[in-house]
């Protein structure tokens, strides 16, 4: 009985570590995706805003 308790504790600890790593990987992946979206979309938004201002400033179109 004394030998089984440390094994179950180690198994539980390993399970917690694995679950924590999986959650951490998913969390960091979502953060990286959000940062990439912000970095990629902000220049596109700036370009569309500039294009809109140019279109408004030019009545010849």
From Swiss-Prot:
Miscellaneous information on this protein: The variola A45R protein corresponds to the N-terminal region of the vaccinia A40 protein.
GO cellular component term, pick one: host cell membrane
Bilayer disposition of the protein: Single-pass type II membrane protein
Organism: Variola virus (isolate Human/India/Ind3/1967)
Cell compartment(s), UniProt: Host membrane
Signal peptide: none
Keywords: Early protein, Host membrane, Membrane, Signal-anchor, Transmembrane, Transmembrane helix
Keyword Transmembrane: yes
The protein, known as: Protein A40 homolog
TM segment ranges: 12-32
Family: Belongs to the poxviridae A40 protein family.
Superkingdom in the source lineage: Viruses
Coarse class of the protein's main subcellular location: host cell
